[in-house]
Amino acid sequence: MGGYIKKPEDIEKRSFEIITEELGEKIKKFTEEELPIVKRVIHTTADFEYADLIEFLEDPISSAKEVLSGGCKIYCDTNMIVNGLSKNILKKFNCIPYTLVSDAGVSKEAKARGVTRSIVGMEHAGKDKETKIFLIGNAPTALYKLKEMIEKNEIEKPALVVGVPVGFVGAKESKDVFKDTKVPYITINGRKGGSTVAVSILHGILYQIYKREGF
């Protein structure tokens, strides 16, 4: 039992070495900025199919880096995303992740209107001008609502939308139709995704800035 790797940094290093080895020629599909994100998603899920499913549209990484470096609010459609993000790194850039799905007022309004809390939460978050990034890992209705608000010019164009809701009802469809918005967008095509995937995508961007700034 003494031969296994014990140090967390060594475990992570070896994990990424394995990912690089097993990706093989697929590495060439991605840019220098995209590849760390792809690897981090695979590291989180242990699923190499994500290398075929992930899609980057409208230069999302550069757009995200600009607003993250200057500080912004990040709306998340689940508490799991908020809790999973690195608060230490976000704090260095004055970035604040938050969600409204558990807000009492949002819950009350959603019940009265007969819609999901994700819809109401997105309506409120979209009107906050400091919110530049949207991470959607659970609710297709949140992604549909965000698309609707963008197309009606009810909100400013986001700097980044990570649209990776998971599931069987509306997940694939919402991700597909959101591409029409021409907003900086990272998505996982098909049914796969989830809150942990949303977290890994933003971390893949954040760590690039973190290293660049020499922290």
Mark where each language-model region is.
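A short, well-structured juxtamembrane/interface segment
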Residues: A51-V67
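Charged, compositionally biased N-terminal leader segments and the immediate start
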Residues: M1-E32
